[in-house]
UniProtKB/Swiss-Prot annotation:
Organism from which the protein derives: Shimwellia blattae (strain ATCC 29907 / DSM 4481 / JCM 1650 / NBRC 105725 / CDC 9005-74)
Entry GO terms, CC: cytoplasm
Pathway(s) the chain acts in: Carbohydrate degradation; glycolysis; pyruvate from D-glyceraldehyde 3-phosphate: step 1/5
Main location, first listed in the record: cytoplasm
Amino acids binding NAD(+): 12-13, 34, 78, 120, 314
A Pfam family recorded for this sequence: Gp_dh_C
Designated name of the protein: Glyceraldehyde-3-phosphate dehydrogenase
One GO process term, biological-process aspect: glucose metabolic process
Biological function: Catalyzes the oxidative phosphorylation of glyceraldehyde 3-phosphate (G3P) to 1,3-bisphosphoglycerate (BPG) using the cofactor NAD. The first reaction step involves the formation of a hemiacetal intermediate between G3P and a cysteine residue, and this hemiacetal intermediate is then oxidized to a thioester, with concomitant reduction of NAD to NADH. The reduced NADH is then exchanged with the second NAD, and the thioester is attacked by a nucleophilic inorganic phosphate to produce BPG.
Signal peptide, first to last residue: none
Enzyme Commission number, as recorded: 1.2.1.12
Length: 331
């Protein structure tokens, strides 16, 4: 049975979710809402500076998209309550505008005829967050959920493997994060975050992130044990988590590597990857795993204090997991 999905917001994540859906037989995108006109949406879908050309045909007919021969309804509504998702057969909405991240605002999609909503960013209220490889099994039928953030999707599986095998006393995370759309090409106004307003291509910019604390929401046993920060760096895509951990149970770095490798081949296959190659960030462009453990990059001071490194394509990996969550809540 194919799940019919609508996308609200055709920005970076909306478009990569769309591309990822073309690789699946269980999910079909039937409607897109964005304030862009259809011709421009088609152009943005066809050509991507980071991920290359769209693998398929994209046309516009009567104001709607025709992708690989299938019509996709296009609308330009500001208020989600007016979207009439039911008329397009939409069952689940991928809420990708970044604007409707509370139960109250996202519920407008339900009012408009959808059955369920997946937010493609961390919720700003108590809406539950689900991360594949961490807490999918706790889903209890909620109609509005969040896929958390790309960084939480990298960190949570890594932290879970460490905690399940060795226990985490406390940990600090740094994500070295690629540039995103909220940053400035040259210095510009950013009243809430002065550093964030500095030119993205010229600077390494320290920034805050709620990703580590969010792990405490998806893995309650780690609540209060993790916090973190970010450095925004002048690369277009692919980020890396540096997790410094004090272990409850002593373990050699070799033992940690074995645990990661076993998880990547077992319960976390498709979520957690493992590599012993001499990799750099561009090697992970297009990576669908949300966390790839870099065995060669990590270090240990002793058997209780270690630094672990894990890579993620902050666009592709995350977008694939949005679809995994849509499929999971539709069972």
């Amino acid at each position: 049975m194919t799940i019919k999905v609508g996308i609200n917001g055709f920005g970076r994540i909306g478009r990569i979710v769309f591309r990822a859906a073309q690789e699946r037989s269980d999910i079909e995108i039937v409607a897109i809402n964005d304030l862009l006109d259809a011709e421009y949406m088609a152009y943005m879908l066809k050509y991507d500076s980071t991920h290359g050309r769209f693998n398929g045909t994209v046309e516009v007919k009567d104001g709607h998209l025709i992708v690989n021969g299938k019509k996709i309804r296009v609308t330009a509504e500001r208020d989600p309550a007016n979207l009439k998702w039911n008329e397009a057969g939409v069952e689940v909405v991928a809420e990708a505008t970044g604007l409707f991240l509370t139960d109250e605002t996202a519920r407008k999609h339900i009012t408009a005829g959808a059955k369920k909503v997946v937010m493609t960013g961390p919720s700003k209220d108590s809406t539950p967050m689900f991360v594949r490889g961490a807490n999918f099994d706790t889903y209890a039928g909620q109609d509005i959920v969040s896929n958390a953030s790309c960084t939480t999707n990298c960190l949570a599986p890594l932290a879970k493997v460490v905690n399940d095998n060795f226990g985490i006393v406390e940990a600090l995370m740094t994500t070295v994060h690629a540039t995103t759309a909220t940053q400035k090409t040259v210095d510009g106004p950013s009243h809430k975050d002065w550093r964030g307003g500095r030119g993205a291509s010229q600077n390494i910019i320290p920034s805050s992130t709620g990703a580590a604390k969010a792990v405490g929401k998806v893995l309650p046993e780690l609540n209060g044990k993790l916090t973190g920060m970010a450095f925004r760096v002048p690369t277009p895509n692919v980020s890396v988590v540096d997790l410094t951990v004090r272990l409850a149970k002593p373990a050699t770095y070799e033992e940690i590597k074995k645990a990661m490798k076993a998880a990547s081949e077992g319960a976390m296959k498709g979520v957690l990857g493992y590599t012993e190659d001499d990799v750099v960030s561009t090697d992970f462009n297009g990576e669908t795993c949300t966390s790839v453990f870099d065995a060669k990059a990590g270090i240990a001071l002793n058997d209780n204090f270690v630094k672990l490194v894990s890579w993620y394509d902050n666009e592709t990996g995350y977008s694939h997991k949005v679809l995994d969550l849509i499929a999971h809540i539709s069972k």
